[in-house]
Amino acid sequence: MDFLNKHSSCISKLFSCPSQWQLNAAPGWQAIAAWALIAAGGFFVISRALLFGRVLLSLFVLPGKSLRSFGPKGSWAVVTGASDGLGKEFALQLARAGYNIVLVSRTASKLDTLSDELTSKYPSVQTKVLAMDFARNQDSDYQKLKELIGDLDVAVLINNVGKSHDMPVPFALTSEEEMTDIVTINCMGTLRVTQLVVPGMMQRRRGLILTMGSFGGLLPTPLLATYSGSKAFLQQWSTSLGSELAPYGITVELVQAYLITSAMSKVRRTSALIPNPRAFVKSVLSKIGRNGGSPGYAYSSSPYWSHGLMAWFLTCVTGTMGKLVVGQNRSMHESIRKRALRKAEREKGKKST
């Protein structure tokens, strides 16, 4: 006891040393933590800057693969949804590049007109046409397509056929017919055509498969829920297919696109964000193999410059799945729906008078 009383002050100092050491060392640890945060922030900023630089190079500087690398002169390109808009423009530009064209769409008269236009502009180009309604999903139609392309060297497949809603609509109010048509055309139509074309490409160990995606598949899109889901499905399917077919020398890309002037988008006026089909298709075919604004998505591309910048901003800055982004998307489509309903009422009133 005397020992404890005698040395109590020393013992007290001894046991107070760790806390005193912690107090003295705290500024050092704070400095280390601060530098660690600065380093992490710097790494984040630099990595984002390098990624953005890569996007700019891909969009504006670096060329894509040559179209001729996918097949020799005299090989064929199959284009679905070929009678209008993007499909028609893909057919025109691929014919200009020297490919023979198989045109597949619903309306026979439009296909015949386009076929005549192609052979008139490019006399050396051959065409074949098949009128089929993808919404019907008939085995007989796909059998006809199989027989049509059976002996052809199909080097390019453009999966362009697609359908959206007539106007933005809550899922609960979506008609069963519209819902079924969207899924059948966008998903089953694309899968079944691709499955007919792929075996020949695998045998020849070359080919190009472009599937038209949408920002609706990149961003959850309220009031276009079924369409958005179908395009998200194509994103996952195409990416998986791209990995499967890469060992066979086949290039697979899902093309992420914002609005384009077309009958489906119902947009008629071009702008910096909304190109016409000619400008858009030119960007797609000149940037094959480049991610454009989609560096984080394997086997995908956003090749048109403004779409690419928007895709980069959404995926790398704001994110695509957050409540704020999805909420803004909902508000935009609610506004579009209101305008569409008012327009329908006006047209209904004009017809009744």
Curated annotation (Swiss-Prot):
The keyword Lipid metabolism applies. The keyword Zinc does not apply. Gene3D superfamilies: NAD(P)-binding Rossmann-like Domain (3.40.50.720). It is a single-pass membrane protein. InterPro entries: 3_ketoreductase_fungal, NAD(P)-bd_dom_sf, Sc_DH/Rdtase_CS, SDR_fam. Its EC number is 1.1.1.330. The active site is at Y227, K231. It is an enzyme of class 1 (oxidoreductase). One of its GO terms (molecular function) is very-long-chain 3-oxoacyl-CoA reductase activity. Keywords: Endoplasmic reticulum, Fatty acid biosynthesis, Fatty acid metabolism, Lipid biosynthesis, Lipid metabolism, Membrane, NADP, Oxidoreductase, Transmembrane, Transmembrane helix. GO terms for cellular component: endoplasmic reticulum membrane. Pathway: Lipid metabolism; fatty acid biosynthesis. It is found in: Endoplasmic reticulum membrane. The chain crosses the membrane at residues 33-53. It catalyses: a very-long-chain (3R)-3-hydroxyacyl-CoA + NADP(+) = a very-long-chain 3-oxoacyl-CoA + NADPH + H(+). GO terms for biological process: fatty acid elongation; secondary metabolite biosynthetic process; sphingolipid biosynthetic process; very long-chain fatty acid biosynthetic process. NADP(+) binds at V78, D133, D141, N160, Y227, K231, I260, S262. It comes from the Eukaryota. Component of the microsomal membrane bound fatty acid elongation system, which produces the 26-carbon very long-chain fatty acids (VLCFA) from palmitate. Catalyzes the reduction of the 3-ketoacyl-CoA intermediate that is formed in each cycle of fatty acid elongation. VLCFAs serve as precursors for ceramide and sphingolipids. Belongs to the short-chain dehydrogenases/reductases (SDR) family. This is Very-long-chain 3-oxoacyl-CoA reductase. It comes from Aspergillus terreus (strain NIH 2624 / FGSC A1156).
